[in-house]
């Protein structure tokens, strides 16, 4: 080490001994070498340019114009390639300061303008950061033809315009906040020059047409976004550029903050409308939720066939829009007819029974029903659900419709869901009302309630406009004194009229929702039904009635699980409405109740559904992190306690893992009462967990509290404290649950956000407490509904064997959501294995059967995807999925009130492509179906699908797939081949020989 340091010092000394005289010649030599390296042609060019600059310095003004023109020609002729700095710009760089001083001396405006034109291009290579000389001299020049300088120069100008505009905005903001209150004049000063907003905008509007003309649609949109003038874009767009411009704008929407996202959608809508692309325009109008815009699209054409095509697009969204001549299509009057045609063409008309998907004969273990203690009535109920989902919409089955005795193989409320499954089999077909009519005259209230619910399901989304049979049949039962009957009728109305904004339903159910004298169950059910009917409308009357319930209900009523559905109803009302929810959130925050924070999270998440807002997701993740930071000692104590607890659990492993599994906590408590040391450890663990701010619940805590109360003298005071703690605990539990669901809702909008959310869910599953872990699987299911990705359902499979049975049940249900309507073979196998694994645990087996039913929804012809190919969010579908997810915050509650699972029926739709001719008759056309490819911003005309298979309509279209016509024999009325598509013969088509 010493030797090395000595050597370094020696070299430093040697270098320091070299005199400056010896160093400078080296630099001069380098310069000489560079000059020598210039070719003869380059040297001549450099000399000529320097001569031209010298002429500009002379007093003879007659030479100025010719010299400037020569300079311009020289620069333009050399800028054919931008792989390196053009040589004239390189050679002129040292003269830039001289040319700037010449500009300041001259007085002739024409010559100054011409010189500013040259200086603007030179400033690209010389100008320092923050000076924006290129833009400054461009604005000082009157030369309008600046396009000849090339694409790179125009892009440089656009960059400086954006920077200057941002400086102006910041300056305006500073002026507004300044204490002297002086107002800004809308300009920004840079090196003594004032950039005015008007001049900058005028130049910007000169640049935009250049970008559009030279395949720079993205640059044009970005520039107008920078200067907040995106509404000025439509005037520059023509039939050659509008498609690429609008595709780029719509793709940008999930990445933009409000109100820019809405401005982009409205601008794209106006462009599509002006170019007569009506099907694209109506998709954006639905996305914006503006009925006036939808009407404008219909009014833009008088073609009745186009009106029908637009009506079919609206029908899939279950909107409340009314238009004369196509009302039966908008009301889904032909949906059942088209679906049965699909079933016939695909040879699916034969009914299936649940055993066809259970495949119990493949299970090597003992028969499910022979297992000790298994409730066969509950498994018959599960079969009713599976049968209803499996044969949904087919109007026939082998289990229930012709077998009146099947209903009585279930018990109590199970009969309600069993009868209601008939409505599921006849969904979208009013013939189901006749099948259910006979059950209305039965004495058992559960059976009658099932018939009422079934009527609502069979009429789901189908509206005649004049006569509403479901409303006529159900309206007399909503005020029935029997809660079972009234709740079923209310729920049936909610399913039947989801998304319809029907005023008659509002008038019927609002008094029930607003009444605080009725049981909270009835009021919550009425509020939920109204929210589904008026999803995403911000209806003031319903909002007021829900808020009244929060304010006027007793503390005991607000402890029930039904409160969650009141909060959910408020969220569904404001779904996708963004900032419009702010007033409601302010009102909620004024309520002094532990539930307040949880309600805010749920309502806020619903309002910003699909926005992909990163800041909101960060806020939710912050809520999910433990609030209190413990010292090292506490952490050490907790680790010790956990270690001891785990060792005891291991010691008692056999008893903990008894088949019932559901009562692990109880068994642990019993064992620890015997073992004094274990009891101390348990108490210690409880204390440290409370310090950490984590919520605790379950049989263990209740038993400990009972011991405390019996030994305590002041039981009354303790009781009050316990109640307050329970309320706070319930509020925290719900807040955590809603925050997890909120991440899924917000991330739905774009693919990158979905990928990131899945990573977050993995972390939450590892580090979250029990309440967070219970909701993570459901959130994963919502993010990938009807999209069975291997990485998602493999993760869910791991969670389905969790020690916490509630985590397992939610994971299994999420697997059903993930594969809803896909018939995915891998998922089907995993669910069959889970059915065998949980053959002795009846609740988990029930959920597994439900998941199997969802997987085989409509024999694989249905979907619950919340987006269509045009990226339009289906609010009715999302609201129906969210209802079951919120119910599963407490799986035991949903198992008791299983009829709420039928809310899913409101969001189910066929995933077919059905081709019709001008007359509305089905025709067979060859289409290519393949994986959708993102073509936004790509050059040329890239293929929109890859790995396609050619099929004849009708065909099924899964998540992430797209279709296109194979030949030009037919012309489509819609740009997206999805759902019902109307085609017309192409008069110019000739068959290839």
From Swiss-Prot:
<dbReference type="GO" id="GO:0000502">
    <property type="term" value="C:proteasome complex"/>
</dbReference>
<dbReference type="GO" id="GO:0043161">
    <property type="term" value="P:proteasome-mediated ubiquitin-dependent protein catabolic process"/>
</dbReference>
<feature type="modified residue" description="Phosphoserine">
    <location>
        <position position="695"/>
    </location>
</feature>
<dbReference type="InterPro" id="IPR016643">
    <property type="entry name" value="26S_Psome_Rpn1"/>
</dbReference>
<dbReference type="GO" id="GO:0005783">
    <property type="term" value="C:endoplasmic reticulum"/>
</dbReference>
<dbReference type="InterPro" id="IPR040892">
    <property type="entry name" value="RPN1_N"/>
</dbReference>
<feature type="compositionally biased region" description="Basic and acidic residues">
    <location>
        <begin position="24"/>
        <end position="34"/>
    </location>
</feature>
<feature type="repeat" description="PC 6">
    <location>
        <begin position="778"/>
        <end position="809"/>
    </location>
</feature>
<dbReference type="GO" id="GO:0030674">
    <property type="term" value="F:protein-macromolecule adaptor activity"/>
</dbReference>
<dbReference type="InterPro" id="IPR002015">
    <property type="entry name" value="Proteasome/cyclosome_rpt"/>
</dbReference>
<keyword id="KW-0647">Proteasome</keyword>
<dbReference type="GO" id="GO:0006511">
    <property type="term" value="P:ubiquitin-dependent protein catabolic process"/>
</dbReference>
<feature type="repeat" description="PC 2">
    <location>
        <begin position="450"/>
        <end position="487"/>
    </location>
</feature>
<feature type="compositionally biased region" description="Acidic residues">
    <location>
        <begin position="665"/>
        <end position="680"/>
    </location>
</feature>
<feature type="modified residue" description="Phosphoserine">
    <location>
        <position position="178"/>
    </location>
</feature>
<feature type="repeat" description="PC 5">
    <location>
        <begin position="566"/>
        <end position="598"/>
    </location>
</feature>
<comment type="similarity">
    <text>Belongs to the proteasome subunit S2 family.</text>
</comment>
<feature type="compositionally biased region" description="Basic and acidic residues">
    <location>
        <begin position="1"/>
        <end position="11"/>
    </location>
</feature>
<feature type="repeat" description="PC 1">
    <location>
        <begin position="417"/>
        <end position="449"/>
    </location>
</feature>
<dbReference type="Pfam" id="PF17781">
    <property type="entry name" value="RPN1_RPN2_N"/>
</dbReference>
<feature type="modified residue" description="Phosphoserine">
    <location>
        <position position="16"/>
    </location>
</feature>
<feature type="modified residue" description="Phosphothreonine">
    <location>
        <position position="24"/>
    </location>
</feature>
<keyword id="KW-0677">Repeat</keyword>
<protein>
    <recommendedName>
        <fullName>26S proteasome regulatory subunit RPN1</fullName>
    </recommendedName>
</protein>
<feature type="region of interest" description="Disordered">
    <location>
        <begin position="628"/>
        <end position="728"/>
    </location>
</feature>
<feature type="region of interest" description="Disordered">
    <location>
        <begin position="170"/>
        <end position="191"/>
    </location>
</feature>
<dbReference type="GO" id="GO:0005737">
    <property type="term" value="C:cytoplasm"/>
</dbReference>
<dbReference type="InterPro" id="IPR016024">
    <property type="entry name" value="ARM-type_fold"/>
</dbReference>
<dbReference type="GO" id="GO:0005634">
    <property type="term" value="C:nucleus"/>
</dbReference>
<feature type="compositionally biased region" description="Basic and acidic residues">
    <location>
        <begin position="681"/>
        <end position="720"/>
    </location>
</feature>
<comment type="function">
    <text>Acts as a regulatory subunit of the 26S proteasome which is involved in the ATP-dependent degradation of ubiquitinated proteins.</text>
</comment>
<feature type="repeat" description="PC 7">
    <location>
        <begin position="810"/>
        <end position="844"/>
    </location>
</feature>
<dbReference type="InterPro" id="IPR011989">
    <property type="entry name" value="ARM-like"/>
</dbReference>
<dbReference type="GO" id="GO:0008540">
    <property type="term" value="C:proteasome regulatory particle, base subcomplex"/>
</dbReference>
<keyword id="KW-0597">Phosphoprotein</keyword>
<feature type="repeat" description="PC 4">
    <location>
        <begin position="523"/>
        <end position="563"/>
    </location>
</feature>
<feature type="repeat" description="PC 3">
    <location>
        <begin position="488"/>
        <end position="522"/>
    </location>
</feature>
<dbReference type="GO" id="GO:0034515">
    <property type="term" value="C:proteasome storage granule"/>
</dbReference>
<dbReference type="InterPro" id="IPR041433">
    <property type="entry name" value="RPN1_C"/>
</dbReference>
<dbReference type="GO" id="GO:0030234">
    <property type="term" value="F:enzyme regulator activity"/>
</dbReference>
<dbReference type="Pfam" id="PF18051">
    <property type="entry name" value="RPN1_C"/>
</dbReference>
<feature type="modified residue" description="Phosphoserine">
    <location>
        <position position="19"/>
    </location>
</feature>
